[in-house]
Amino acid sequence: MVTDGPAALAEFDRSGADIVLLDLMLPGMSGTDVYKQLRVRSSVPVIMVTARDSEIDKVVGLELGADDYVTKPYSARELIARIRAVLRRGGDDDSEISDGVLESGPLRMDVERHVVSVNGYAITLPLKEFDLLEYLMRNSGRVLTRGQLIDRVWGVDYVGDTKTLDVHVKRLRSKIEADPANPVHLVTVRGLGYKLES
């Protein structure tokens, strides 16, 4: 455990890590700057830790690419559960199979053939819905902000609002959820964005 940004980077360079818990409020160098430097060095999973409970801090952390966030004060049990979940996602990578097929819960997507099935039954998706679902499946279990989803699916030059995304999510839910009004797979994370649960 280190207590400032430069020391954190030096320790990472010296010893490496399987996962990093990164406090946004570090002396000497901001947590976001440390995160950017870590990303230059490695794709190690990062959980942002912050004393702030504001929505904007969570959004910034997730849009930077953090794997998860936890707000102080937190229990040891919560932190351990989050660490295990992030390591499980990163280590097993069970949402993607080497032959170009993605799987998450009841969903199966053959990216090359542009085929999607739910519980073994094929469904038809327009291109944007397919692209949206593909990105969600490649990040199964991870909170994705509206900004991340729009940039990835519609492009960084998109000038519309987030309603377009919400409409596409609603259409996707009507095709992949048993009860679209009460989704259990494509869920809303209030104030942040969406997450695909496996």
From Swiss-Prot:
This is Sensory transduction protein RegX3. It comes from Mycobacterium leprae (strain TN). SUPFAM superfamilies: C-terminal effector domain of the bipartite response regulators, CheY-like. The keyword Phosphoprotein applies. It comes from the Bacteria. GO terms for cellular component: cytosol; protein-DNA complex. Residues 1-87 form the Response regulatory domain. Keywords: DNA-binding, Phosphoprotein, Transcription, Transcription regulation, Two-component regulatory system. One of its GO terms (biological process) is regulation of DNA-templated transcription. SMART domains: REC (SM00448), Trans_reg_C (SM00862). Residues 99-198 bind DNA. One of its GO terms (molecular function) is phosphorelay response regulator activity. Phosphorylated by SenX3. Pfam families: Response_reg, Trans_reg_C. Member of the two-component regulatory system SenX3/RegX3.
